[in-house]
Amino acid sequence: MKKHIFLSCLSVSLISCGPSSKEAIFYNDGIMGIVNKVTVAQNNFFDQTDGHNIDSLVICQKLYAQKSKESLDEIAKLNAFANKTGYLDAAKVFVNTLNSLANNEAKQMVEIMTKDTSSVTELDIKTVSDLSDKLNKETDEATKLIEDAQQQFVKEWKFELDHNHDKKHYKH
């Protein structure tokens, strides 16, 4: 009987402990997988903005918009971790920001950059430059927000990100 009571108390105490560091790592990997999908697509778009290959620019902008939409759908399916939403909220802001940039500023840049070169004006060039600056600024702000939230999450759940490897290794 004493053994049964002990095991019951032990199982209740283990259940009430909440998520483990390993579960936090898994959650982090899920969020970062979604974030990285849209980040890679945005970087591919940026790589094509030199104007040398207009077809690639158009394709990369469409892929950027598609990946950002997919990321929005995926991030919307995630739940809070241990009833805390800070990290998830930052990820949602990040993905929403990149989605908006893909469908507005990046799209406007492509519309201008795909014009016949003889019809491109100085105002068009300035507009592309301004749009590019806005893309960079808003991406940097969203990146800082999610990086700060990730660091807080890592600290709270007591694991470390090891950025010295191609694949992240975690210490807990």
Predicted feature residues:
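Immediate post-signal-peptide N-terminus of mature secreted/exported proteins
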Residues: 17-66, 163-172
